[in-house]
Amino acid sequence: MASYDLVERLNNTFRQIELELQALQQALSDCRLLAGRVFELPAIGKDAEHDPLATIPVVQHIGKTALARALRHYSHLFIQQQSENRSSKAAVRLPGAICLQVTAAEQQDLLARIQHINALKATFEKIVTVDSGLPPTARFEWVHRHLPGLITLSAYRTLTPLVDPSTIRFGWANKHVIKNLTRDQVLMMLEKSLQAPRAVPPWTREQWQSKLEREYQDIAALPQRARLKIKRPVKVQPIARVWYAGEQKQVQYACPSPLIALMSGSREVSVPDIGELLNYDADNVQYRYKPEAQSLRLLIPRLHLWLASE
């Protein structure tokens, strides 16, 4: 059980995040808006969090509407702030960018504010995932006992400031989480599951136990040096590619929230060129580079566990 001191730290850190976000919203509102473009994505319904997305239609908002949506988005931390039909397990994404005219002093002040908020968010995430000492399955209940309705991913998400960018382009990224494992590591995973029997719908406890035993036997029959890997697709993500003309450098950013471009004019860029985010269509994805696929055989679908050929 997490200690009282830890719960106090959890609550205090979160309250600081809320207060700092409110102050940042006011500070950003006080700046002159040069340009704004955000892209509204469809709401994810309850129980549809893990459904693969073949298409994602995008609705664009510009100017003051984009700024208002961006400011609201930064503090969208609770399910009570959204429709009852929207999933509480999937954080809302709003890719895009707001560009604000600032003096050099204002730029430094806003950068410091954002850095402080991001540090608080990192502290909050560490309290939940590390300091609590709780396994992932118990964290949700613990956090929501003290902060009912919190969308934890939204609380963890950092803000991304840009300093005098020249161009901002948007796109989509398809990725996989890949983890290489030995046969013995997989056997240990399955052994832990076997030692904690439970029912997993639609299977009864006995049926699930029998399924685990078959999986264990299949893996145990492999050579000890078998090359195994978990290859799990990650939900397609909006990204931004930002070009800094002064440094002749392009940087790619994850873009679940609007980027905050602070334009001081010191690099001879008055307003950056902001591109569009097009609708996503899985059947028409164009890869910049797609390496030759390794020959893999699926062994345990529920774990996304594959056997690589020698």
Curated annotation (Swiss-Prot):
The gene is tus. NCBIfam families: rep_term_tus. GO terms for biological process: DNA replication termination. GO terms for cellular component: cytoplasm. It comes from the Bacteria. Keywords: Cytoplasm, DNA replication, DNA-binding. It is found in: Cytoplasm. Trans-acting protein required for termination of DNA replication. Binds to DNA replication terminator sequences (terA to terF) to prevent the passage of replication forks. The termination efficiency will be affected by the affinity of this protein for the terminator sequence. Belongs to the Tus family. It holds the Pfam family Ter. This is DNA replication terminus site-binding protein. GO terms for molecular function: DNA binding.
